[in-house]
Amino acid sequence: MKYEFKSFAKINHFLNILDKRKDGYHNIQSIFQLINLFDVITFEQRSDNIINLNCNIENLKQNNSILDAINIFKKEYKIKKLGLDIYLKKSIPIGGGLGGGSSNAAVTLKALTEIWKIKKNNYSLSNLALRLGSDVPFFLNGKNAWVEGRGEIITNVDLKPYWFILIFSQYSVS
């Protein structure tokens, strides 16, 4: 069976960087807004333990957020046999500062809970998300939000619709 998910990008309306934490991260304040730019990730179960990841971008590293999410999920839920064919249709620019990798990781966590019919415990899934990256809990939440702490304190907010013009450089910013 194939499962297909949209993995949305986000913009930061602003980013207020506060004090440095003992864990090496900084506390932040920001408003994150999902935008209508997304990657599409398709998952199909395999009967073996092989994970194949294919992408429309040739140089996508085999060490990426989707595989990181799979590995952390397998360890957390003690899944021995997890074979998947994954196809990532990348539309969010890599290194564009729009959270594409974090969004892909969050979607992967959601997909795996659905594919393996794991009863979701939002607290444990959020902890997994935070281990993958500071933006991942926001994408797991899936709503526009006021974000604080390292990124794990999330308060949903209603935002008016906006039009944005995004300009992408050849240089990576994340």
Q: Which positions does each model-derived feature cover?
A:
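Phosphate-handling active-site elements
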Residues: 75-85, 111-130
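ATP-dependent small-molecule kinase catalytic core of the GHMP/sugar-kinase superfamily
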Residues: 2-33, 118-174
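N-terminal beta-alpha supersecondary unit
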Residues: 2-82
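DPxDG-like acidic metal-binding loop motif
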Residues: 96-124, 138, 142
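Generic preference for hydrophobic
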Residues: 53, 86-88, 147
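Residue-level signature for short turns and capping positions that connect secondary-structure elements
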Residues: 18, 48, 58, 91-93, ...
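Short pre-catalytic strand/loop immediately N-terminal to key active-site residues, enriched for Gly-Thr
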Residues: 84-96
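Generic beta-strand or strand-like secondary-structure segments
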Residues: 65-72, 104-107, 111, 128
